[in-house]
A protein has these predicted regions:
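Short proline/glycine-enriched turn/loop motifs at strand-loop junctions of beta-rich domains
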Residues: 11, 20-25
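Short beta-strand segments within Ig-like beta-sandwich modules, predominantly Fibronectin type-III
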Residues: 39-45
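Exposed low-complexity, polar/acidic, P/S/T/G-rich flexible segments that act as propeptides
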Residues: 68-80
Length: 394
């Protein structure tokens, strides 16, 4: 077999084939981060024999192998035994359904990264501080002006690529949905007080996703749909609108394209079965999280029946005194994605639309990082004992 290692970035969920002069062939599967996984022979699994060759110049840029033995490199399988591209893509998609970077029983630090790319700021970079969490990272969010992706921005491309290289499992691009009110009847009370009330139609949302995927094909691995209904009470009729939106996204980008929704609260039982991958279902103060009011629980019984990897809790106003209680609560609620910050939320006269103090304008303080990494990786108790021991010795 050829010697050497693959290097460079590849389109997420693509297939890479390397043909060698001596007849050896490498067939590799690229995961959602653009990294190569173990050897997978799709010729056996899918009987795929028609490949799209990218040419030698591209081959040398993408792979680092003994060049004398490489004859060609292929990426993305466009056909199988003369069959249609669509059919082969369907088969690959079926296989990809079970390939997820989020493993049952594991925990992930999934930060709310609404701040602008600033990788060039060195030690003062908010992103650099965030990416210091390394392999503990789960989902990261790219947010350009609340989801304006029409034009390419090199800073966003570089920042997203750096996040994936640092250890983030998936990079999703922010698009606001504003609770689906844009397509409600004009007289519907849910539209009252909503800025740009007619803006966020399904067509507008899908166009923003399309631009994000076009401009950042390797980095845009999913969408973060903000301001999504929870399905309770008067919001229940809008669930069908969201189901339609999810289906359109799936039809366009496949199962491997991550759909993350932010409801900010627990969701109605009817919404749990909807085709999203992750729901940010808590976004409140630590005090509220710890109280877990039975009248408005953090997680409903129906939600608790689902895999932990579907849920994402965001807790702000966390302190050194209540941090341990907060992570204990997260463990008891069996949530896989967690963002804990000592940032504060202070709502202004315009409520949630324009808060006076935004808990996401900066990363958490430095004391949060070692505790969170320890919790994610399952050794927080040992970490706390070591810290206590060191304190006694001083």
């Amino acid at each position: 077999m050829p010697t050497g290692k693959f290097s460079g970035r590849f389109p997420a969920w693509s297939v890479v084939q390397v043909d060698c002069l001596d007849g050896d062939t490498f067939v590799k599967f690229v995961d959602g981060t653009g990294r190569l996984t173990g050897q997978v022979d799709y010729r056996e699994k899918l009987d795929a024999r028609v490949w799209c060759h990218v040419g030698m110049a591209e081959a040398y840029r993408l792979v680092a192998l003994d060049a004398s033995r490489v004859t060609d490199v292929s990426m993305d399988v466009p056909g199988a035994n003369g069959g249609s591209t669509k059919e082969l893509e369907r088969q690959i998609d079926l296989l990809a359904r079970d390939v997820s970077p989020f493993v049952k029983g594991h925990r992930y630090y999934s930060p709310v990264t609404y701040f602008w790319p600033d990788y060039y700021n060195g030690a003062t970079s908010k992103w650099n501080r965030t990416l210091g969490y390394g392999s503990s990272l789960g989902v990261v969010i790219m947010n350009r002006n609340s989801g304006d992706w029409e034009t390419f921005d090199a800073d966003f491309q570089k920042q997203a690529a750096r996040a994936l290289s640092a250890g983030a499992k998936r990079c999703v691009f922010y698009v606001k949905t504003q609770y689906g009110v844009a397509e409600l009847p004009k007289e519907d009370p849910a539209r009252t007080g909503v800025p740009d009330v007619d803006k966020y139609t399904q067509d507008y949302i899908l166009q923003q996703i399309a631009w994000a995927k076009k401009n950042y094909p390797n980095e845009c691995q999913g969408v973060f749909l903000d301001e999504v209904v929870n399905g309770w009470g008067a919001q229940a009729p809008r669930l069908d609108w969201y189901r339609q939106l999810f289906k359109k996204i799936r039809d366009l980008y496949g199962k491997q394209f991550l759909i993350v929704v932010n409801t900010g609260s627990n969701i109605a039982d009817d919404f749990v079965s909807a085709d999203f991958d992750i729901c940010m279902c808590f976004e409140e103060k630590a005090e509220t999280y710890l109280k877990n009011d039975a009248a408005k629980p953090v997680m409903t019984d129906r939600m608790m029946q689902e895999p932990a990897t579907r849920w994402w809790h965001v807790i702000h106003d966390v302190t050194k005194d209540n941090y341990q209680k907060v992570v204990n609560q997260a463990a008891s609620l069996d949530v896989a994605h967690l963002y804990i910050t000592d940032g504060q939320l202070v709502k202004g006269e315009d409520g949630q639309w324009k808060p006076e103090v935004n808990p996401y304008q900066n990363p958490p303080s430095e004391w949060v990082m070692p505790l969170t990494i320890a919790w994610v990786n399952g050794y927080l108790d040992i970490f706390n004992r070591v810290i206590a021991l060191e304190a006694k010795q001083k």
